[in-house]
UniProtKB/Swiss-Prot annotation:
Signal peptide extent: none
Any one of the GO CC terms: mitochondrial inner membrane
Protein's UniProt keywords contain Membrane: yes
Keywords, alphabetical: Membrane, Mitochondrion, Mitochondrion inner membrane, Transit peptide, Translation regulation
Family per similarity comment: Belongs to the ATP22 family.
Subcellular localization, as worded in the UniProt entry: Mitochondrion inner membrane
GO molecular function term, any single one: translation regulator activity
Gene: ATP22
The protein, known as: Mitochondrial translation factor ATP22
Length: 697
């Protein structure tokens, strides 16, 4: 205890006009006698003077503070502390006495607020007020070592008004050194000024670049950058560095911003989901801004994948689908297929301490192929599929379906298994730097195959005359039908035994070629083959694809299709049922039309067709509660004599409904990503898809 007395005596003796009795102070610290403490406190109060609370005395004040905190625990010695406070000459002095006493958490902040209030309201000179404010901040810095110091906004406003422009650097250096939060408007306005119009040294200080040049000072960046700034201010500072094209330490900046987002904003239960989504969107936009300015798409892909991996459990799907779509779209626009692969491969590592199950790969590969298809390079898609699905039968499959020869030689002809396996054909493949996480020893499923068909046919449609495109589709259909006829005997290809590719080809023949009659004939011929029974559900009904809005078929053909569906036990779907409603209504048989409408309602199919709803309203049929009531009201108010806009709207909606048959098997990236993003958050490996109907019309 004598050491405590000596330090306090040394401090007071140095800065006061006359020395304080060292022996009396030592006695005060080494005993709890009331008279001794009162005598010491009184001398301290009289001698402490206006000169004590200055920056140059902070070090010794801290030593005194430490001795007081050692002598007085936060839970005890209340009387002694009260006696010390009572010796203060005014409220300002009392506020500083309290800063020296033990405290923690909110109490420290409250004491600082009191001290700031008293200093600013006192009669001291502006220079003296500045020194006292700095001293108060320095005294609480140790108490808030693990957190940023919340200095009252009033102090920041006072500093902003008092400081000269040439004093900004020293002021900010002091605040950063002591871990003061700079999020208050007045404080951050100084940061903005220094970033936008300051010297290079000022920019480096407020951006913390100054602390990134060596290992020792880097600790300041790592400990304080996300302490003095919140997420939004960090985002602003880093954005300014990107705009300045100052990329030297950009990975450090972006990684610490992501860490701040993951560990604070996204874990804060008080923050709404909308605000959290906004933060993720801002981070993504910053990544893409950096990529655009620097051309570093690699870092964009790596950091976004890392963000997805680190999100709190349960936060995926809707939160990430739009940012992922934007990142993918950007990488595609920049012709960066390799970065797309790295991005998706990185996203699979959702659990750093758990190896992702191989059963999750098919969903990931569907996302990759969907993305690669946007590059309009069928060779790239084929090369990726062959190298992702390492089974030799993959090349045999593409050869038998005519896709291999169409992609590499421009004609749809089958290749024998021997030819497909030959070194000459293998040489056609472009090397793809495929992450090991995306390799399977199996053949692609129907979802992947639909994407491949789309990739190849989209290019062909833009390159060849319409008649040649029609012949290509017919040839591919014949090869597909032949393949499916043999498929029941091939275990390797059981994943393809559904109607996904069938619906896609029929859709293209009916809608892209415009030959509804040919589509009908091909469909009937397909199911006329013996044992041709691919897996089919209401959502995957190929008859709906052909019958919907098809004016090229007759009543007899329609009845044949219905009879065949019944014989095959293929369930009715919306398109087939609504087609029957409209068919009988146009033929004048309203009773049968109503019968089919009743089936439509009982099946709880979505009421998407304006013509069906108009017909129901015209004849007083019951409109189900689940129908789009806004559309029903709109149709009820519509003037039947004004056909032009109504017909136009019907045409648009018909086109949308028809296009669903194609988009169902070639979903845009955000639709494909949704399931993956959701599953990334799960604790167990992904389950293999039980049905590929969502991947095809």
């Amino acid at each position: 205890m004598r050491r405590a007395g000596f330090q306090a005596s040394s401090l007071l003796g140095r800065i006061c006009s006359s020395g304080l009795n060292c022996k009396k102070l030592t006695v005060a610290f080494s005993s709890n006698e009331h008279m001794a403490m009162s005598s010491w406190a009184g001398d301290l109060g009289r001698r402490i003077g206006t000169q004590l609370y200055r920056r140059e005395n902070v070090a010794e004040l801290r030593r005194l503070q430490a001795e007081l905190q050692q002598q007085w625990t936060a839970a005890g010695d209340g009387r002694a502390r009260a006696e010390l406070e009572a010796c203060a000459r005014d409220e300002e002095e009392r506020a500083f006495f309290r800063l020296l006493m033990p405290a923690s958490g909110p109490e420290v902040t409250q004491r600082l607020e009191e001290a700031v209030k008293e200093v600013l309201g006192g009669r001291s000179s502006r220079a003296e007020k500045r020194e006292r404010l700095y001293c108060a901040i320095a005294l609480v810095a140790r108490e808030n070592a693990g957190r940023g110091i919340e200095v009252p906004e009033a102090a920041h406003r006072w500093f902003a008004a008092d400081l000269g422009r040439n004093e900004y650097f020293g002021h900010m250096q002091f605040l950063i050194e002591h871990g003061v939060q700079l999020n208050a408007p007045a404080a951050f306005q100084l940061v903005r000024t220094m970033l936008r119009s300051g010297s290079e040294l000022e920019v480096q200080l407020v951006s913390f670049k100054l602390f990134l040049y060596d290992t020792e000072s880097r600790r300041v960046f790592e400990e304080k950058f996300d302490r003095v700034y919140d997420f939004m201010r960090m985002h602003y500072v880093i954005t300014q560095m990107v705009v300045r094209r100052d990329f030297r330490f950009m990975r450090d900046y972006l990684e610490v911003l992501a860490r701040r987002l993951e560990q604070h904003e996204l874990c804060d239960a008080r923050m709404s989901a909308a605000v959290q989504r906004d933060h993720i969107a801002r981070y993504t936009e910053l990544l893409m801004l950096y990529a655009r300015k620097s051309g570093d798409e690699k870092m964009l892909a790596e950091l976004f994948a890392s963000l997805v991996d680190s999100l709190p459990r349960g936060m995926g799907g809707a939160t990430l689908r739009q940012p992922l779509h934007e990142v993918m779209t950007y990488l595609i626009s920049e012709n960066q297929p390799q970065q797309v692969l790295k991005l998706v491969a990185g996203m699979r590592k959702a659990e750093p301490n758990r190896r992702p199950g191989k059963s999750s790969v098919p969903g990931t590969l569907a996302l990759v192929v969907s993305a690669l298809r946007q590059f309009n390079n069928p060779n790239l898609v084929v090369s990726f599929i062959v190298q992702a699905y390492r089974k030799t039968q993959t090349r045999v499959l593409l050869g038998q379906l005519g896709l291999w020869s169409l992609a590499f030689y421009g004609r749809a002809v089958a290749l024998s298994p021997e030819a497909a396996k030959s070194p000459q054909e293998l040489a056609q493949i472009s090397p793809v730097d495929l992450p090991k996480e995306l390799i399977l020893k199996s053949v692609p499923d129907s979802c992947i195959m639909c994407e491949l068909y789309q990739a190849i046919l989209s290019e062909k449609r833009s390159q060849v005359p319409a008649e040649e495109y029609r012949e290509i589709l017919i040839q591919l259909f014949a090869l597909y039908q032949d393949f499916m006829g043999k498929l029941v005997h091939k275990y390797d290809y059981y994943h393809l035994y559904d109607t996904s590719v069938l619906r896609l080809l029929l859709y293209k023949i009916k809608n892209e070629v415009g030959d509804g009659e040919l589509a009908f004939k091909l469909l009937m011929d397909f199911y006329g083959q013996p044992k041709m029974r691919p897996k089919c559900t209401a959502e995957g009904n190929p008859f709906g694809v052909v019958l919907y809005q098809n004016n090229a078929i007759t009543q007899t053909q329609l009845n044949q299709a219905l009879a065949l569906m019944g014989g095959l036990r293929i369930p009715m779907d919306f398109k087939t049922t609504s087609s029957m409603v409209l068919w009988y209504a146009s033929a004048g048989d309203i009773d049968l039309a109503h019968t089919w409408y009743t089936k439509l309602v009982r099946g709880r199919f979505q009421m998407k067709n304006r013509r069906v709803l108009k017909l129901a309203l015209a004849h007083g049929w019951t409109i189900p509660a689940y129908a789009d009531q806004q559309l029903v009201s709109e149709l009820s108010r519509a003037d039947n004599s004004s056909d032009g806009p109504e017909h136009t709207q019907e045409a648009v909606e018909t086109a949308v409904l028809e296009s669903e048959e194609a988009s169902a098997c070639t979903s845009i990236i955000i639709e494909k990503a949704d399931e993956l993003l959701h599953k990334i958050q799960q604790t167990r490996p992904l389950d293999p898809p039980s049905d590929t109907r969502s991947a095809a019309p």
